[in-house]
Curated annotation (Swiss-Prot):
Mn(2+) binds at H27, H75, D161, H165. InterPro entries: Fe/Mn_Superoxide_Dismutase (IPR050265), Mn/Fe_SOD (IPR001189), Mn/Fe_SOD_BS (IPR019833), Mn/Fe_SOD_C (IPR019832), Mn/Fe_SOD_N (IPR019831), Mn/Fe_SOD_N_sf (IPR036324), SOD_C_sf (IPR036314). Shows decreasing activity with increasing pH. Slightly inhibited by azide and fluoride at pH 7-8; the inhibition is drastically increased towards lower pH. This is Superoxide dismutase [Mn/Fe]. It holds the Pfam family Sod_Fe_N. It comes from Propionibacterium freudenreichii subsp. shermanii. Keywords: Iron, Manganese, Metal-binding, Oxidoreductase.
Length: 201
């Protein structure tokens, strides 16, 4: 298999009480695994199509690959973007903190904009803080499903899963409470590392 399911960098219950261990186990072991399997299956079927010179299903196969691979990428970032409360800084500092101040005016402004983007998603999607290498700036984005609405080249720094499977067992349909709780477990060390790497990519 080309793609494999990464291990979580902490125990299922490590993010409690903000995100329950039950959610984390289902989310990682079932949902994320399904995207990994789906991406590998799409690659296999594309290889079969090449061997047979039969591309009648190319549109479906390309969509399947994009959807599942994006789901795998997003979740792989999402897990590392979080850490048990108290194990990482509560807000960004140094170069990332300065960049957020530059592009949003303040950390609180960025947090408010990101929260609005997350809670405003209609249906399933992601809120993301990204580095735009063309504009040399940080933006907030809403992804629909896993890949739609994403400008090519944007590099995710901070990802928040707004699919119902990420919160419904604990927060029901109250997205705002989920997002408010999630801020407590953001791993700003990981976000800062992604920012440093993205700027020189």
């Amino acid at each position: 298999a080309v793609y494999t399911l990464p291990e979580l960098p902490y125990d299922y219950s490590a993010l409690e009480p903000y995100i329950s261990g039950e959610i984390m186990e289902l989310h990682h072991d079932k949902h994320h695994k399904a995207y990994v399997d789906g991406a590998n299956t799409a690659l296999d079927k594309l290889a079969e199509a090449r061997d047979k010179a039969d591309f009648g299903a190319i549109n479906k196969l390309e969509k399947d690959l994009a959807f599942n691979l994006a789901g795998h990428v997003n979740h792989s970032v999402f897990w590392k973007n979080m850490a048990p409360k108290g194990s990482a800084p509560e807000r960004p500092t140094d170069e990332l903190g300065a960049a957020i101040d530059e592009f949003f005016g303040s950390f609180d402004n960025m947090k408010a904009q990101f929260t609005a983007a997350a809670t405003g998603i209609q249906g399933s999607g992601w809120a993301s803080l990204v580095w735009d290498p063309l504009g040399k700036r940080i933006n907030t984005l809403q992804f629909y499903d896993h890949q739609n609405n994403l400008p090519a080249g944007s590099i995710p720094l901070l990802q928040l899963d707004m699919w119902e499977h990420a919160f419904y067992l604990q927060y029901k349909n109250v997205k705002g409470d989920y997002v408010k709780s999630w801020w407590n477990v953001v791993n700003w060390d990981d976000v800062a590392l992604r920012f440093s790497e993205a700027r020189v990519a």
